[in-house]
């Protein structure tokens, strides 16, 4: 019976077959491993894609919510600004009305001081003393009104303006042309830019004329002298 060493070519062939078989087995295992790894990679990629898609959806939802919150904040801020401005305006209007009410109560006192000043005759020391006392109080009142934003309007010599003046008379004037304020009976005042009291004035109707007005009585004209009729002579028969 021949031994294994008797057929060395068979031994080499067997070795080659075994080597080839081992190689095929190794390749098969690598292929299986590669296939398994590819499947795992595909599954991981699919999971990652789904996770990314979900995160994108959540990000879009978050962005939409943020946009809604921003719009809500803008509306709330605008409402607050409107409320603040309205409150400030109402506060200023109330303060303006209160100042106007106070000034209108003070102005008659100022008028009284000015009338007294015009009527007072400074002939004695007592009269001058009273005048100085009046003037001190008058100056305090005027200064107080100035600090509140009150100013006296100039009327005489100004064109008549119904927004500033109240005409109570119309009279001829040699100094001022027609429709110009000629006399001021009571001064007008402003509180800031607001007219709080119109000036009571007389408006010029133009230069006076020497022609008699229609109401003047007409001067009777002299009648022509009549010639007396001569008496008739009686007829004698």
From Swiss-Prot:
Keywords: Chaperone, Cytoplasm, Stress response
Localization, UniProt: Cytoplasm
Polar residues composition-biased segments: 227-237
Gene Ontology MF terms in the entry: adenyl-nucleotide exchange factor activity; protein homodimerization activity; protein-folding chaperone binding; unfolded protein binding
PROSITE patterns: GRPE
Function: Participates actively in the response to hyperosmotic and heat shock by preventing the aggregation of stress-denatured proteins, in association with DnaK and GrpE. It is the nucleotide exchange factor for DnaK and may function as a thermosensor. Unfolded proteins bind initially to DnaJ; upon interaction with the DnaJ-bound protein, DnaK hydrolyzes its bound ATP, resulting in the formation of a stable complex. GrpE releases ADP from DnaK; ATP binding to DnaK triggers the release of the substrate protein, thus completing the reaction cycle.
PANTHER family: CELL CYCLE AND APOPTOSIS REGULATOR PROTEIN 2, GRPE PROTEIN
Record's protein name: Protein GrpE
Organism: Synechococcus sp. (strain JA-3-3Ab)
């Amino acid at each position: 019976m021949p031994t294994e060493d008797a057929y060395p070519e068979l031994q080499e062939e067997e070795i080659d077959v075994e080597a080839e078989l081992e190689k095929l087995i190794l390749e098969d295992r690598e292929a299986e491993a590669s296939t398994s790894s590819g499947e795992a990679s595909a599954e991981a990629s699919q999971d990652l894609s789904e996770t990314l898609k979900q995160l994108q959806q959540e990000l879009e939802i978050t962005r939409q919510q943020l946009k809604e919150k921003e719009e809500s904040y803008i509306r709330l801020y605008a409402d607050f600004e409107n409320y603040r401005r309205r409150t400030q305006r109402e506060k200023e209007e109330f303060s303006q009305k209160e100042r106007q009410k106070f000034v209108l109560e003070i102005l008659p006192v100022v008028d009284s001081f000015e009338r007294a000043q015009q009527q007072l005759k400074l002939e004695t020391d007592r009269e001058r003393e009273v005048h100085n006392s009046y003037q001190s109080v008058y100056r305090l009142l005027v200064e107080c009104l100035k600090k509140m934003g009150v100013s006296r309007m100039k009327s005489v010599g100004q064109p008549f303006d119904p927004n500033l003046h109240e005409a109570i008379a119309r009279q001829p004037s040699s100094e001022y042309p027609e429709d110009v304020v000629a006399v001021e009976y009571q001064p007008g005042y402003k509180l800031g830019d607001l007219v709080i009291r119109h000036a009571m004035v007389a408006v010029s109707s133009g230069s006076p004329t020497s022609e008699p007005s229609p109401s003047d009585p007409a001067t009777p004209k002299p009648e022509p002298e009549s010639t007396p009729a001569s008496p008739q002579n009686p007829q004698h028969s």
